[in-house]
């Protein structure tokens, strides 16, 4: 691995840490590192089920923000860059609003893009939760969670206004294999994974320091 060689060339030790596990270290710290962490990336979404600091299940789904952008662009007949700009910058985009609440005139390009983004966000969240349920049901070993668990989200794709409300609408507790306490967006979601990596690095450094003292 080229990046590993570069880092180690500067005298650092490297450790591979999955994106969703790093997010769990940051987002589940107030719940005894127990719960579900979902990192909503551009190319894919990464999921980790953690129990008391140990990852019991982790996987990825090959859909993310880019999947939304590409499908909206195809449906609306516009460049992907235009869709991305609307998704990331439009003050009118709110996933909780219906089409009739838009100030844009029906049929305008902006109007069509915003409503297509809403539709594909709902499809992405539904796909994500369906896959998570499937992974739970087919896993050989899943912890027996004694209490309801939190689900934390991070990553740029989760930053669109109204995203957490869409998650709540798509979620069906009766069909989900474990009880869920709540859904939250981790603070400063863009840097949450990096902070989780830092926490793990600091912990390793402390443990190595204690070993040397012994």
What do these predicted ranges mean?
Residues 40-42:
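A generic beta-sheet turn/junction motif
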Residues 1-37, 51-60, 65-84, 88-123, ...:
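Nucleotide/phosphate-binding catalytic cleft detector across ATP-hydrolyzing
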Residues 45-49:
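Short beta-strand scaffold segments in enzyme catalytic cores
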């Amino acid at each position: 691995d080229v990046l590993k060689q570069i880092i180690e060339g500067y005298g650092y030790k490297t450790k591979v840490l999955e994106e969703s596990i790093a997010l769990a270290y940051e987002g589940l710290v107030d719940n005894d590192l127990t719960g579900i962490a979902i990192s909503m990336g551009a190319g894919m979404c990464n999921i980790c089920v953690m129990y008391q600091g140990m990852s019991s299940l982790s996987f990825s789904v090959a859909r993310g923000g880019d999947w939304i952008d590409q499908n909206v662009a195809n449906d609306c007949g516009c460049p992907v860059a235009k869709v991305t700009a609307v998704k990331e910058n439009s003050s009118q985009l709110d996933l909780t609003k219906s089409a009739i609440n838009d100030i844009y005139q029906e049929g305008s390009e902006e109007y069509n893009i915003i409503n297509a983004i809403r539709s594909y966000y709902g499809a992405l969240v539904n796909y994500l939760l369906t896959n998570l349920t499937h992974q739970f049901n087919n896993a050989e070993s899943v912890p027996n969670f004694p209490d309801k668990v939190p689900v934390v989200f991070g990553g740029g794709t989760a930053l669109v206004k109204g995203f957490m409300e869409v998650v709540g609408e798509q979620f069906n507790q009766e069909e989900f294999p474990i009880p869920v306490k709540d859904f939250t967006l981790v603070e400063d979601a863009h840097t949450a994974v990096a902070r989780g990596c830092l926490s793990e690095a600091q912990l390793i450094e402390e443990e190595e320091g204690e070993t040397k003292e012994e």
